[in-house]
Structures are given as structure tokens and as C-alpha cells.
């Protein structure tokens, strides 16, 4: 019984169960009643965004009701005149880092993933990459600083990066997921397969969750 657990994850799973049962009024009631309790619960924030998009009715959860409007793109070209050489140097350093094939309890399928935070005692090129990410975080905030959602209004003053690297092989992919312990998530593609106009290797952003889904949910 999810209600008896009373923790960050169980409250979201209870909402997903209510959605499966079609109890929409109860969903809104719970999200609104717990809006102050869950103001930084990204599991609930993600579900709230989902239900708002489907039902076209806002909740009192103000973390970020329209997350697809906060997608931000950049390019290493804007940080390095010779970005190709920089990428190759980063890749060479990443090759020295231990990885596991399809690690358990992770979202990597048919691929390798590193086992620890790359930005803890980083090598030179990875440290340079870390500096680029920090500058991009500042650019991200500058772009959205006038928005009233909690994602921006409660923007952390201290930057603490956690990262890992993934190498996907043939037919490899990342299953749908969020990073509930991170204020903001991102990905840097260092090497990609040719697109062939079929979106091979492309990331998809959606409001659907691991255990809740609607065919008309917006995606990018």
C-alpha cells in the first residue's frame, strides 16, 4: 500500500495508481494538498506536469508545469575553436575509465556505463568539460530567469555536478527516466551515429512516466 509508506516515491506511485483507476479528482486533491510538502519532489513534479498536459488544468505544484518549454540546446563549438580535437581528447580520457555492461538498476541497455561521478577528482580534459557545463548552467539560468516556476525561483546558489558516461552499442538505448536527485539534468553527445533521417541516437523528451502513459502526451 503506497499510502502507508508516506515517502517521496510512494506518493508518486499512489498518484500513478489513481491515474490507472481513472480517479482524476483524487489526483488533483492530493497534489494540491501536498504542494508545500512536495515542492522539491521531482517525482511528483513530473507527474503533475503529465496530468496538467493531459487534463489542461493546473495543479498547485509549481516546480515546473511545462518542462518541455525549458529544453535548452547548446554546442561545444561555442566554447572551443577546435571542438573536434577537444572532443577526441575527452573521449580518449573517458576510455581509461572503468565501465560496466548494462549495470543493474540503471537505464542503459546494450551499452556500457561508468560507475562513479566523473567530476569527482576529474582529469584535465574532463575538468575543462566541467567548466563548460558550469558556464552553460549560467546561460540556462539567464535564459529563463524571468520565469516564475520554482525550478527558476529556487535556483540553487551552489553548483554540484554529478556525471557519468555511456557507450551504446548496436541497438543500444536509454530507457525513459528522470534524475529526481538533480535540480537540472543534461546530456552531452560526444559521438553519434549518422542520422540517415531516421532519428537514430536522438533523444526524445516526453511527459510520460515509467508507470503512467497517455498516447497524446506532448513530446519533443
Task: Describe each region flagged by the PLM.
Residues 60-152:
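Non-heme Fe(II)/2-oxoglutarate
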Residues 56-58:
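Terminal transmembrane helix and immediately flanking juxtamembrane interfaces
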Residues 47, 74-81, 89, 93, ...:
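Structured loops at beta-to-helix junctions and adjacent beta-edge loops in soluble globular domains
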Residues 19, 28, 39, 72, ...:
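Sequence-level detector for tyrosine residue identity
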Residues 124-134, 138-220:
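Catalytic core of non-heme Fe(II) oxygenases with the double-stranded beta-helix
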Residues 1-54:
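Alpha-helical protein-protein interaction scaffolds
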Residues 25-37, 62-83, 166, 173-176:
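Charged, low-complexity, helix/coiled-coil-prone segments
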Amino acid at each position: 500500500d503506497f499510502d502507508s509508506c508516506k515517502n517521496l516515491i510512494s506518493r508518486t506511485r499512489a498518484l500513478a495508481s489513481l491515474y490507472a483507476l481513472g480517479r482524476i479528482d483524487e489526483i488533483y486533491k492530493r497534489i494540491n494538498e501536498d504542494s508545500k510538502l512536495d515542492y522539491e519532489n521531482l517525482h511528483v513534479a513530473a507527474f503533475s506536469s503529465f496530468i496538467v498536459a493531459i487534463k489542461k488544468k493546473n495543479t498547485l505544484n509549481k516546480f515546473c508545469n511545462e518542462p518541455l518549454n525549458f529544453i535548452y540546446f547548446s554546442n561545444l563549438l561555442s566554447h572551443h575553436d577546435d571542438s573536434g580535437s577537444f572532443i577526441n581528447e575527452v573521449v580518449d580520457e573517458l576510455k581509461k575509465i572503468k565501465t560496466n555492461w548494462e549495470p543493474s538498476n540503471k537505464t542503459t541497455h546494450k551499452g556500457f556505463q561508468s560507475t562513479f561521478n566523473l567530476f569527482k577528482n576529474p582529469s584535465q580534459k574532463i575538468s575543462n568539460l566541467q567548466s563548460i557545463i558550469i558556464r552553460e548552467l549560467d546561460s540556462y539560468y539567464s535564459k529563463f530567469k524571468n520565469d516564475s516556476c520554482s525550478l527558476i525561483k529556487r535556483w540553487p546558489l551552489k553548483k554540484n555536478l554529478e556525471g557519468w558516461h555511456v557507450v551504446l552499442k548496436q541497438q543500444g538505448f536509454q530507457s525513459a527516466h528522470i534524475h529526481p536527485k538533480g535540480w537540472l539534468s543534461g546530456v552531452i553527445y560526444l559521438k553519434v551515429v549518422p542520422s540517415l533521417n531516421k532519428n537514430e541516437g536522438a533523444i526524445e523528451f516526453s511527459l510520460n512516466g515509467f508507470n503512467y502513459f497517455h498516447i497524446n502526451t506532448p513530446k519533443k
